[in-house]
Curated annotation (Swiss-Prot):
Family: Belongs to the Necrosis inducing protein (NPP1) family.
Domain notes: Key residues/motif important for the effector activities are degenerated in most NLPs, including the nlp24 peptide consisting of the conserved region I (11-aa immunogenic part) and conserved region II (the heptapeptide GHRHDWE motif) that is important for phytotoxic activity.
Keyword vocabulary terms for this entry: Glycoprotein, Secreted, Signal, Virulence
One Gene Ontology cellular component: extracellular region
Motif extent (Hepta-peptide GHRHDWE motif): 122-128
Residues in the signal sequence: 1-19
Protein location: Secreted
Residues carrying covalently attached carbohydrate according to the record: 141
Protein name as annotated: NLP effector protein Pc118548
Functional note: Secreted effector that contributes strongly to virulence during infection by P.capsici. Induces cell death in the Solanaceae, including Nicotiana benthamiana and hot pepper.
Lineage of origin: Eukaryota, Sar, Stramenopiles, Oomycota, Peronosporales
Length: 246
């Protein structure tokens, strides 16, 4: 292939990529999925252990994607840490994906934030997540064995968490400013938080899963690792492996 043909092919490839980019929606106009009635054991367990999220720093969580696959446009990171992101009138969302890992049933819960701030900058799209480890996917015959959460650096872990951090079956998390990581991160808290409508990976539409599996909702900054959707196909098991607390 000569240089001219190569250049034309490259231009055509760029045009194809641009043509298949997802539709963007203002961050506060993304319509969350309504929480459906759980049917499978996995779905029932995800609902049983749905956590609470208290916000002491940064944005409140928002929906990341809607039924047609349209994605949040996010927010510029500049300005106040909670500027234009104190909550959507349409409601919020917590995403979940579950599977066996070693001999534990892992339930990941993930929250999307339209921007992430660091001392030196920030980026659009930010994710925080926690993994509740149980001994069975059957909601009627399982109990909490441990918990892991995305921290300032690495993961916070407890096996099991202390009772003061649990309300019934719901672990309470706080999104706070981590001095070590210089960013928003999760920690256990005694404070009550909000519970968002839950949508599990298998309850999402194909269009929504396709968007989440791409990079449209990954946070990117030149000075940090890419903040990827933690429950997408090629990332989920890697996150379980790194967060495993036993």
């Amino acid at each position: 292939m000569n240089f001219r043909a190569f250049l034309l092919a490259a231009i055509a490839g760029i045009a194809t990529i641009n043509a298949t980019e997802v539709n963007r929606v203002n961050h506060d106009q993304v319509q969350p999925f309504a929480q459906p009635e759980p049917i499978t054991d996995s779905q029932k367990s995800a609902v049983k252990y749905k956590p609470q999220l208290h916000i002491s720093y940064g944005c409140h969580p928002y929906a990341a994607v809607q039924t047609d696959g349209s994605a949040s446009g996010g927010l510029e990171w500049s300005g106040r840490v909670d500027g234009d992101c104190t909550g959507s009138q349409l409601g919020s969302q917590v995403y979940s994906r579950s599977d066996w890992y070693h001999d534990k049933w892992a339930i990941m819960y993930a929250w999307y934030f339209p921007k992430g701030r660091y001392h030196l900058g920030g980026h659009r799209h930010y994710w925080e997540y926690a993994i509740v480890w149980t001994d069975s996917p059957t909601s009627s015959n399982s109990s909490i064995q441990g918990v892991s959460m995305s921290a300032g650096v690495g993961y916070g872990k407890a096996t099991p968490p202390m009772l003061k951090y649990i309300d019934g079956n719901s672990i309470k998390f706080d999104s706070h400013f981590s001095l070590l990581g210089n960013k928003a991160a999760l920690q256990l808290t005694k404070e009550a938080g909000e519970r968002q409508d839950l949508i599990t990976w298998d309850q999402l539409t194909v269009a929504a899963r396709d968007t989440l599996n791409g990079d449209a909702l990954d946070g990117k900054a030149w000075f940090t690792d890419k903040d990827e959707v933690p429950f997408k196909d090629d990332i989920f098991v890697k996150r379980l492996q790194k967060a495993f607390p036993f």
